[in-house]
Amino acid sequence: MAYTFTTLKTAIQDYTQNSETTFVSQLSRFILNAEERILKECQLDVFRKNVTGTASTGQQYLQKPGDFLAQNSLSVINSSNKEFLLYKQVTALQDYTPNPTTTGTPKYYADWDEVTFLLAPTPDSNYTMELHYFYRPTSITESADGTSWL
């Protein structure tokens, strides 16, 4: 059965047989906490996305999507082949290419910060990259039509 935000709140109230004001006013928080726990505990297919982008010549950093939570894989697409990069720690990439002007086809990547990947070696030309990742879907409490992945 598909739930809207309204029908989910009603179902919770019916199940708990509780219409007390404080309980009812906290249902949104209760639902958000449940969504968050499911997101952290289960790697469901509905939490996966893939995007393509370009790693630019001489740029060792690659921007992450705005809804990014965690990577599954990153690859360079050469003609029809995909070359998967190995995920490493930043220090391993800095040991591998201590000079950021060292260029080539990227072989490794790391989380530089919350919004950026670090590539090594630095791309020697423009490469099409494909990222498979986990993202945070819109909460049923924030959805415009009151529906979501639940």
PLM regions with names:
Residues M1-L150:
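Glycine-enriched, solvent-exposed interface loops adjoining structured elements
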